[in-house]
């Protein structure tokens, strides 16, 4: 598993660094052509063009000064996980300039040395609270995400 974990770490670092610098095309190139990126805030994006647009039109439209540090990357060549510490400065109305930090776990399915599916688990409420959103806005977002989780269980 050592060399497979090292290969995965190189791949996910290439993806995360491309995202941090706003290079959507380079991030999307880490995926198979019909790969999926499931973002904890923005939802699911399928295909390289959708992933490129997500990076450029969502991530970098709503935030700046990204930092994404990875640790404990493990892979068997098909399934992979990595812990991360992620931060950014918000551009969203009402939270402009707020630095947001959270940690989480990346869950990755691999195919032919590329990402077939990227997903993540982190505490979205912690991130929203750092942006000083009103409690009602945070509760509304968390209720929506909870309903999505419940629906996915069926």
List each model region and its residues:
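Short, low-complexity N-terminal intrinsically disordered segments enriched in polar/charged residues
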Residues: 1-33, 138-154
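A solvent-exposed, acidic/Ser-Thr-rich amphipathic alpha-helical stretch
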Residues: 5, 24-78
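Short beta-strand segments enriched in hydrophobic/aromatic residues
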Residues: 31, 86-88, 122
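General beta-strand recognition
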Residues: 36, 81, 116-117
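Short, cysteine-centered beta-strand-loop-beta hairpins and adjacent loop/turn segments enriched
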Residues: 61-64, 88-99
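Short, surface-exposed coil-to-beta transition loops
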Residues: 66-68, 100-106
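A short hydrophobic beta-strand element
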Residues: 77-88
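Short beta-strand edge/turn micro-motifs at domain boundaries
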Residues: 103-140
């Amino acid at each position: 598993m050592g060399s497979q974990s090292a290969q995965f770490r190189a791949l996910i670092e290439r993806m995360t660094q491309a995202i941090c610098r706003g290079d959507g095309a380079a991030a999307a190139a880490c995926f198979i052509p019909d790969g999926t990126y499931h973002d904890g805030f923005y939802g699911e994006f399928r295909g390289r063009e959708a992933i490129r647009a997500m990076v450029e039109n969502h991530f970098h439209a709503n935030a700046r000064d990204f930092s994404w540090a990875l640790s404990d990357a493990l892979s068997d060549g098909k399934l992979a996980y990595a812990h991360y510490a992620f931060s950014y400065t918000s551009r969203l109305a009402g939270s402009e300039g707020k630095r947001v930090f959270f940690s989480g776990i990346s869950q990755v399915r691999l195919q032919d040395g590329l990402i077939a599916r990227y997903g993540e688990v982190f505490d979205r409420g912690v991130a929203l609270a750092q942006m000083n959103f009103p409690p009602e806005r945070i509760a509304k977002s968390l209720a929506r995400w909870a309903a999505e989780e419940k629906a996915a269980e069926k």
